[in-house]
Amino acid sequence: MNDNSIEHIQECYIEDYNQWAYMIDKSLKECLGETDTSVISQLIQINKSNADGPLAGVPYAVKDLFDVCGFPSRNSSVLPEFNACATKNSAIIERMSQLGATCVAKTQMNEFAYGLTGENPHFGNCRHPLLKNCLSGGSSSGSAYLVAADYLPLSFGTDTGGSIRLPAAWCGVYGIR
């Protein structure tokens, strides 16, 4: 029987995340950034009020530049001024929530989105999901990684000088600027 209920989809996502978190290959943890299953469960509970939306139950991630209320937007930096938790959501988070989707992760990136490789001296380099000796591209590296590895159906990044297009091309997924 194929159960496509919101609850089933979300349970499968949490089950999959638990498997990813313990992978020997640490590149996924480096790409995910600030997320754990209790956070995912909390975000799912918050979003159940929009269970009728066209994207109900769809998990997605955002680059660590986007504000998610209650979570720090670190810009993949360790500077203390970036440790404060956001007091409101970015517009894309609000809109996706209205549509019923659930933000389940903030992804790794080049520090301050300044780079095209996926390298980060503080949180580790975001490796290519299939070619372990290669990088995923940047600066929206974690977003491309999660979609290319088929962990999430979509993820949001930012693009000024190729920061979506390069990692999408390097990882073999579609990236829309």
Predicted segments with their positions:
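Short, well-ordered alpha-helical
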Residues: 1-85, 113-115
